[in-house]
Design a protein with these regions (language model features):
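Cation-handling catalytic/transport regions enriched in His/Asp/Glu
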Residues: 1-201
């Protein structure tokens, strides 16, 4: 850790992350452990297992009331969920959809997964592999978070400040996911199936 007070400081330096932020994150995660353990115990019981393994985390514990969500329906959910971010933000989401910023469906030779790539001279591009399910709705919200982050950064910042670390990048995408989850919780209301399905996320 030459030139640094610690190996931790050295590792955080390139992302411009203060050690206090790192320690706050660790503390917050540790604080959430009891709720996480309760959730895992509930999942284990719901699946009727003596021991829960990593692969069990992907097994649905309830019927899926969200199966068959088309891309168009997914976008409507995302529009509504992200409305708190303001009119300009939502209008840019419309542009992204209408102006071909997004490659939506699987195709031969297309890379799997989902990605967003911002460019300094034009709008961002988003690659999806939409599957008509709730996970794809969250993926759409997540990748649009990256795309909008790049769009605003490129528009508002001089070139030297346009880039950002992965630590910062994931804030915009995770905020979008949190807003989507909050919106879905509100919409589910007393619908037990929709409420219970959150256990699968």
């Amino acid at each position: 850790a030459r030139g640094y007070k610690s190996c931790l400081e050295m590792c955080l330096f390139s992302g411009d992350i203060p050690e206090s932020v790192y320690h706050s994150l660790i503390e917050a995660v540790h604080g959430a452990f009891p709720a996480f353990y309760d959730y895992m115990a509930l999942r284990r019981r719901a699946l009727g297992l003596e021991q829960l393994h990593m692969y069990d985390l992907y097994v649905p514990v309830t019927e899926n009331p969200y199966q068959g969500i088309t891309y168009e329906q997914a976008f409507e959910l995302v529009f509504k969920a992200l409305a708190p971010l303001g009119e300009e933000y939502v209008s840019l989401l419309h542009r992204a959809r209408d102006e071909g910023w997004i490659d939506v469906y699987e195709n031969q030779g297309k890379r799997s997964g989902a990605y967003s790539n911002g460019t300094p001279t034009c709008h961002p591009f988003v690659l999806l592999n939409h599957q008509d399910n709730l996970e794809s709705v969250f993926t759409l919200a997540h990748e649009l978070g990256h795309a909008m982050h790049s769009y605003f950064s490129n528009r508002e910042q001089p070139p030297i400040y346009r880039g950002y670390s992965i630590f910062v990048a994931e804030v915009a995408s995770t905020v979008n996911e949190a807003l989507l989850l909050r919106y879905l919780e509100k919409e589910a209301g007393q619908d037990r199936k929709k409420g219970a399905y959150r256990c699968n996320l």
